[in-house]
Amino acid sequence: MSSYFVNPLYSKYKAAAAAAAAAGEAINPTYYDCHFAPEVGGRHAAAAAALQLYGNSAAGFPHAPPQAHAHPHPSPPPSGTGCGGREGRGQEYFHPGGGSPAAAYQAAPPPPPHPPPPPPPPPCGGIACHGEPAKFYGYDNLQRQPIFTTQQEAELVQYPDCKSSSGNIGEDPDHLNQSSSPSQMFPWMRPQAAPGRRRGRQTYSRFQTLELEKEFLFNPYLTRKRRIEVSHALALTERQVKIWFQNRRMKWKKENNKDKFPVSRQEVKDGETKKEAQELEEDRAEGLTN
């Protein structure tokens, strides 16, 4: 029952509640266990008295039923619990249309228990998954289409080692095309030297310079085998040894003003012996003439 209907007629409901109490229809005393229960109990008693007071007048109308419709109300706490609240959560009480107010509040039937959840299905849905990878969960596995065929895989670019592919910046990159795969080499793939940049000058230590000078005095021209030995002994590259000998031979020619450079030390000795022999012959010829 709405509070808008109860509050204006509270004085009449109070008188009707007193009349109902005198008639022997007492309200459940457990309503007054808590400090806020008298207000709730008084409202329920007033509502029950109003139904009895105005029920007969409402019965004269054909469209109105003789009894009020049922609507749920919160349950008062039992006498054993006091102000502690209800016995269980979710338990509600309903008020039927007829009967005394004390007997009208009955416990609603408990809701049916929820059925237990079904057991989880087996991982493979009853199908033996071990030994049958082709049909997992009852479905055929998808056939993967190869992205490349065997011929295309053979034609894929096989990148060489970075050290061998990079090479020196100043060297001709044509040999890179020969060593790499037969695929097309674009111009932007070739290593290019920076424009206007010169290679740094190589510096040699005193030990390296001394050993190179000794080798130059012994033989100004090195063979390929001897050049490899010298480069390994001095921790240099063959190119560095070759360039050093070229520069040293040019320096010797400028210092001696000679077009022909001695091939080896043996030729130098032979030249000296020839000069000495010529001088001796000249001295003998002078002695005979005198």
UniProtKB/Swiss-Prot annotation:
Localization per record: Nucleus
Bias kind Basic and acidic residues: ranges: 255-278
UniProt keyword annotation of Transcription present: yes
An example Gene Ontology molecular-function term: DNA-binding transcription activator activity, RNA polymerase II-specific
Record-level GO cellular component terms: chromatin; nucleus
SMART domains the UniProt entry points to: HOX (SM00389)
Keyword Cell wall biogenesis/degradation belongs to the record: no
DNA-binding region, residue intervals: 197-256
Gene Ontology biological-process annotations: anterior/posterior axis specification, embryo; negative regulation of transcription by RNA polymerase II; positive regulation of transcription by RNA polymerase II; regulation of transcription by RNA polymerase II; skeletal system morphogenesis
Similarity comment: family membership: Belongs to the Antp homeobox family.
Function recorded in the entry: Sequence-specific transcription factor which is part of a developmental regulatory system that provides cells with specific positional identities on the anterior-posterior axis.
Protein known as: Homeobox protein Hox-D8
Name of the gene this protein is made from: HOXD8
